[in-house]
Amino acid sequence: MSKPIYNRILLKLSGEALQGDEGFGIDPSILDRMALEIKELVEMGVEVGVVLGGGNLFRGAKLAKAGMNRVVGDHMGMLATVMNGLAMRDALHRAEVNAKLMSAFQLNGICDTYNWSEAIKMLREKRVVIFSAGTGSPFFTTDSAGCLRGIEIEADVVLKATKVEGVYDKDPSKFNDAKLYNTLTYAEVIDQELKVMDLAAFTLARDHNMPIRVFNMGKPGALREVVMGTTEGTTIS
């Protein structure tokens, strides 16, 4: 039987991935499916860290344009990721997966504060670790948090789950002839200004040689396919 090509992964899930067709909030059926897909990886022996976005509940940048202080908006966005983290932890527990939720800032009584050595210890014990509250600082996206935590926990790859099959040369929702890339280099992404993630997050990954794999989490079984080394999605290295 073939083995996973990654021992430890950082899975970056957008908040929008959790909302399904609802347009807002959390779709319980999608949450449960994701929990079962993560469980499958754990049973294969893969160590899983998860970073969640919060865009399904709140977007700080959007309100900042309407006049809200950006720092306040970003703090609210960070709390939205904690709410998503609580939901994901609950879904994993219901799927009988041992999971720990950590926040970048103190939330006593709700979840643990992020601790690097503790996170590594839990991953080695095959517990899923969910990292919430972004980086804990405003002006940084959850993609930056995903790359940062991936580098810190020495993950083999950052898996960015999206609503499309991977990275295209142009927007596939607008252009029928958009070409899907199988592999790209960091330089190609920057030269062609391809939308993978924000530049701060992307350059952080590049500077630490952290491979990024973009794939469609909406496709059942895609996460397993990626971890098993199929050509699913786009690999950037």
UniProtKB/Swiss-Prot annotation:
The keyword Ligase does not apply. Pfam families: AA_kinase. CDD domains: AAK_UMPK-PyrH-Ec. It is an enzyme of class 2 (transferase). It comes from the Bacteria. GO terms for molecular function: ATP binding; UMP kinase activity. GO terms for cellular component: cytosol. It catalyses: UMP + ATP = UDP + ADP. Residues 20-25 are annotated as: Involved in allosteric activation by GTP. Disulfide bonds: none annotated. InterPro entries: AceGlu_kinase-like_sf, Asp/Glu/Uridylate_kinase, Uridylate_kinase, Uridylate_kinase_bac. One of its GO terms (biological process) is 'de novo' CTP biosynthetic process. It is found in: Cytoplasm. Keywords: Allosteric enzyme, ATP-binding, Cytoplasm, Kinase, Nucleotide-binding, Pyrimidine biosynthesis, Transferase. ATP binds at K12, L13, S14, G15, G55, R59, T162, Y168, D171. Pathway: Pyrimidine metabolism; CTP biosynthesis via de novo pathway; UDP from UMP (UMPK route): step 1/1. UMP binds at G54, D74, T135, G136, S137, P138, F139, F140, T141, T142. Its EC number is 2.7.4.22. The keyword Cell membrane does not apply. Allosterically activated by GTP. Inhibited by UTP. Homohexamer. Catalyzes the reversible phosphorylation of UMP to UDP. Belongs to the UMP kinase family. This is Uridylate kinase. It comes from Haemophilus ducreyi (strain 35000HP / ATCC 700724). The lineage of its organism: Bacteria, Pseudomonadati, Pseudomonadota, Gammaproteobacteria, Pasteurellales. The gene is pyrH.
